[in-house]
Amino acid sequence: MEIPKSHDEWLQLRLKGIGGSEAAAVIGQSPWCSNVELWKRKTGRATAPDISNNEAVQYGHDAEPLIRGLFAIDNAHKYKTEYLGEFDMVYHPKYPFIFATLDGRLTELETGRRGILEVKTTSIVRSMQKEQWWKDGKPCIPQQYFIQVLHQLLATGWDFAVLHAQLKYEYGDNPDDIRTERRSYLIERSDHLEDLEYLEEKEVYFWTENVEKDICPGMILPEI
């Protein structure tokens, strides 16, 4: 584990590998960044936009410790919840360019198993956004967040992850009618071994064959 002393130092360290929020871009599943754009950023040809002043980003940053605290209280019978630090970075034991900054570390009280806590906040202002969290009438995780959790499991080697999301509904006729809902999704490492192997293979190839050799990857278009 490495503990950067500042946000700027953390950003510089992120240039040396692939972080959790970037994993989906490697395989063409990010709605915000293509694999080619990510390659440009990692090779110094482009700079990631500064989104620190974005209202949704600020809300998520400020809400995270509160939501993590509520999760810890609600699940005190099941998990010990720990906060590692805002900039603490956990590295893959074999591939140090695969790393993660975690929202929390969980210890399952009954078994002692280690797990990841990933906190998400999202504002749903139209019905199409709600559909990302529902599939066939059942709650689900948006693909880019699922890939982020898989990446974190790769970096840590831990047994499971819990994605704890607050959904804030803001669409409707009344702008003051805001409802919130919190959901927890359990992702077991043992249930996704093939997915983990696939993601690791793609991330290793992207870094060693594209970034380190300075060869632009072919553009991966998202499935429609």
Please give the residue ranges for each predicted region.
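Charged, glycine-rich intrinsically disordered N-terminal tails and low-complexity linkers that flank
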Residues: 1-62, 66
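Acidic-basic catalytic patches of nuclease active cores, encompassing PD-(D/E)XK
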Residues: 57-83
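Nucleic-acid nuclease catalytic cores
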Residues: 73-102, 106-211
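Long, amphipathic alpha-helical segments that form or neighbor coiled-coils/leucine zippers used
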Residues: 216-224
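Intrinsically disordered, low-complexity boundary segments flanking structured domains
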Residues: 25, 66-70, 170-174
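Residues that form generic nucleotide/phosphate-binding pockets
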Residues: 13-14, 26, 38-42, 70, ...
